[in-house]
């Protein structure tokens, strides 16, 4: 008799474990027949809405043509500026910029040194003196460029304010000297007492000479620019005597010179 060959194929897997074939028990599930419930279909009549034309709300803008002597400024709308946003916080000064198309004598900006640009009211301009186009060497806004919205910032835009050295020295050495009094007289700006900038409504050229005393020769880091066509001149006035015995005004003159 020949040798019997055992065939183990299909009995063990690759790891040598025996393969056990288990028969899966077939569970017979009885089908439960449930009677179908008949649903009532109720039709609801939807109300028919007749389309009505909406009234277009027109934006009301109060025009102030009496504020201007220039023909370009006649149709400039009056936009007011909220000056309650910490205008005298010199150390952390990041405030809303003056709006592009507004000026009222009762609401004047407290400092003209931001971005070396001078803001003046439209009433101080005339067609014969005001430039119709922007002079790029002097950062001065003329009324025509302000209305065209070409270079002026938006009303809602917030621009970082660059405080000058005098503002920082005042805030450190003489914070009690920063005062502001408002006159209730029409067409008068704020009266700033004991500040380095004072708004003076005059054509007196002698007021400009005080600025030239403190301006450096190269004028590279000097933020104060005076527009020749404005009727506002800027004066540097010394602050009052503080209870501290620090000659901070003498320190300022040495630093600027």
Swiss-Prot record:
It comes from the Viruses. This is Uncharacterized protein ORF257. It comes from Acidianus bottle-shaped virus (isolate Italy/Pozzuoli).
């Amino acid at each position: 008799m020949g040798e019997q060959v055992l065939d183990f194929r299909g009995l063990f897997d690759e790891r040598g474990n025996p393969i056990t074939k288990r028969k899966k028990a077939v569970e017979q599930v009885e089908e439960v027949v449930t009677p179908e419930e008949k649903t009532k279909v109720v039709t609801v009549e939807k109300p028919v809405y007749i389309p009505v034309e909406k009234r277009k709300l027109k934006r009301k803008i109060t025009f102030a043509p009496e504020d201007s002597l220039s023909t370009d400024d006649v149709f400039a709308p009056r936009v007011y500026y909220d000056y309650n946003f910490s205008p005298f916080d010199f150390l952390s000064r990041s405030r809303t910029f003056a709006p592009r198309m507004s000026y009222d004598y009762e609401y004047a900006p407290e400092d003209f040194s931001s971005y070396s640009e001078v803001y003046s009211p439209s009433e101080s301009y005339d067609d014969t003196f005001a430039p119709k186009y922007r002079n790029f060497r002097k950062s001065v806004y003329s009324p025509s460029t302000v209305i065209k919205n070409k270079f002026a910032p938006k009303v809602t835009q917030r621009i970082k304010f660059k405080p000058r050295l005098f503002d920082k020295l005042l805030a450190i050495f003489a914070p009690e000297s920063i005062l502001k009094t408002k006159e209730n007289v029409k067409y008068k700006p704020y009266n700033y007492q004991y500040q380095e900038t004072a708004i003076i409504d005059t054509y007196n050229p002698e007021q400009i000479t005080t600025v030239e005393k403190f301006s450096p020769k190269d004028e590279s880091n000097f933020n104060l620019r005076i527009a020749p066509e404005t009727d506002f001149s800027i004066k540097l006035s010394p602050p009052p005597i503080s209870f501290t015995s620090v000659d901070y005004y003498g320190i300022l003159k040495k630093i600027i010179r």
